[in-house]
Amino acid sequence: MAISDSVSPEPQQLLCLTITAFRKPGMSEAAYREYMTKTHAPLVSGLMEEYGIVRYNMTHNNSKSRPLLFQLYDPEFSKLSDYDCIVQFVFRRMEDFLRMKSDPRFLEKVAPDHQKFADTSRSTMTIGYFEEFLENGKVVPK
């Protein structure tokens, strides 16, 4: 079987866009989390639902949570990450996410909102295929 350079997902396979996000310089951790969860997330969540985005979540990595990692310390995985938050979007098709990003409401309200809290010059992104093995404490049958 030949290996192809173009990789396309299986019809039911979900995509996951992951952003390792940094807060705007001068913004406190508390203000960043408050803004992201109470202002930005509500601003974009309805639009995501409208365009069929399956999942949108944040994991905040701050000065209270970072030291917890030392309780899990393992020499194999010992490097601490310094980002402030991981943001993940799970969706069925690229077209769904792209249509949402081209919606006038996204362009007029959501996109400019990032300047209020995010240091996009430091943030990184990746996209891959989402697969879940444990959900609500139960093994997901494969």
UniProtKB/Swiss-Prot annotation:
This is Conidial pigment biosynthesis dehydratase EthD. Induction: Highly expressed during conidiation. A conserved conidiation regulatory pathway containing BrlA, AbaA and WetA regulates expression. During conidiation BlrA up-regulates AbaA, which in turn controls WetA. Moreover, the Hog1 MAPK regulates fungal conidiation by controlling the conidiation regulatory pathway, and that all three pigmentation genes Pks1, EthD and Mlac1 exercise feedback regulation of conidiation. Disruption phenotype: Leads to the production of dark red conidia. Does not affect virulence. SUPFAM superfamilies: Dimeric alpha+beta barrel. Dehydratase; part of the Pks1 gene cluster that mediates the biosynthesis of an anthraquinone derivative pigment that contributes to conidial pigmentation that provides protection from UV radiation, heat and cold stress. The polyketide synthase Pks1 produces 1-acetyl-2,4,6,8-tetrahydroxy-9,10-anthraquinone though condensation of acetyl-CoA with malonyl-CoA. The dehydratase EthD and the laccase Mlac1 further convert the anthraquinone derivative into the final conidial pigment. The lineage of its organism: Eukaryota, Fungi, Dikarya, Ascomycota, Pezizomycotina. It comes from Metarhizium robertsii (strain ARSEF 23 / ATCC MYA-3075). Disulfide bonds: none annotated. Residues 25-121 form the EthD domain. Pathway: Pigment biosynthesis. The gene is EthD. Keywords: Monooxygenase, Oxidoreductase. GO terms for molecular function: monooxygenase activity.
